[in-house]
Amino acid sequence: MQTYGNPDVTYGWWAGNSGVTNRSGKFIAAHAAHTGLIAFWAGAFTLFELARFDPSVPMGHQPLIALPHLATLGIGFDEAGTFVGGTTVTAIAIVHLVLSMVYGAGGLLHSLTFPGDMQDSEVLQARKFKLEWDNPDNQTFILGHHLIFLGVANIQFVEWARIHGIWDAAAGSIRQVEYNLNLSSIWNHQFDFLTINNLEDVMGGHAFLAFFMITGGAFHIATKQVGEYTKFKGSGLLSAEAILSWSLAGIGWMAIVAAFWCATNTTVYPVDFFGEVLDLKFGIAPYWVDTVDLPNGAHTSRAWLTNVHYFLGFFYIQGHLWHALRAMGFDFKRVSSAVSNIGTASVTLND
């Protein structure tokens, strides 16, 4: 974290990142605990939505988030899209709750029992995951493993669609989808992905990403930088705060893209489960409104997802700018100091 040259800086309790900045063991513990929180939310919220779900009302016209995503995966609904009971959905929710306890226990184990810094571990492979923020070889090694996990997740999604099947809005049923690995089509969808209208291309994009990420991950793990680590290559810029800022930029950008995609696309976000497409409005900030008449105070699943993603993405981007400026050495305390001194400041003109 940025210290502005103070070697004995003290952070407040709210600066949670400061406690794990140079302690890779605690960093892993925080990751595991965070995963547990996400799994707990997924399981608990699925049960909450299942208790409120009304089969007589279109799913897209109910304030639901988890159930529509399960429905698009063909879980809890038959091939015609009819709700077939909550047994499978309940089982998935409970599995997530159990996993949340496992992840939470893993976080406690890493935090209380294992070394706070992986560099002190007795396991050789574990020591490779020590944190050296200004060492590109160390950072690229860790990045490579992240990319491989993301690639494997893409493979799981593609294979689920190919073997089990997912909801096809055009056919109005669940069907198996073979990915279209046409590189020309994938390349062109970089510019019109918001209007993609067939599942084969969607799966093809995920299959390409799986190959790209796993290959890139292996490359980052196996290779080291060529030549001297100079300022031109980023020496002096690579730091914990800089990497945090880039992470916030990435997740913020993805959230905003997801908002636009959810608002307009009915192939990935079917009308059956998410409701009708939205209209973009402008007030103090951009926002999306429903195009269908609903009871007072009610909104479609699409409206909830779109607006939440957009505003979260907006604030993530603000966090990116904040931490990026700090990483570059900008001291925000000087701003408040300058503002407070405006009334007493004087200007002297030299002859």
From Swiss-Prot:
Keywords: Chlorophyll, Chromophore, Membrane, Photosynthesis, Photosystem I, Photosystem II, Thylakoid, Transmembrane, Transmembrane helix. Its cofactor is divinyl chlorophyll a; divinyl chlorophyll b. It is a multi-pass membrane protein. The chain crosses the membrane at residues 27-47, 64-84, 89-109, 202-222, 242-262, 305-325. InterPro entries: PS_antenna-like, PS_II_antenna-like_sf. Its main location: membrane. GO terms for molecular function: chlorophyll binding. Induction: This transcript is moderately expressed between 4.5 and 72 umol blue light/m2/s. The whole antenna complex is most highly expressed under low light; as the light levels increase antenna complex levels decrease. Thus at least in this strain the amount of antenna complex is controlled mostly at a post-transcriptional level. Transcription decreases upon iron starvation. GO terms for biological process: photosynthetic electron transport chain. The keyword Membrane applies. It is found in: Cellular thylakoid membrane. One of its GO terms (cellular component) is plasma membrane-derived thylakoid membrane. NCBIfam families: PS_antenn_a_b. This low-light-adapted strain contains 8 pcb genes. Belongs to the PsbB/PsbC family. IsiA/Pcb subfamily. The antenna complex functions as a light receptor, it captures and delivers excitation energy to photosystems II and I. The Prochlorales pcb genes are not related to higher plant LHCs. The antenna complex consists of divinyl chlorophylls (a and b) and divinyl chlorophyll a/b binding proteins and binds more divinyl chlorophyll b than does the antenna complex from high-light-adapted Prochlorococcus. This is Divinyl chlorophyll a/b light-harvesting protein PcbA. It comes from Prochlorococcus marinus (strain SARG / CCMP1375 / SS120).
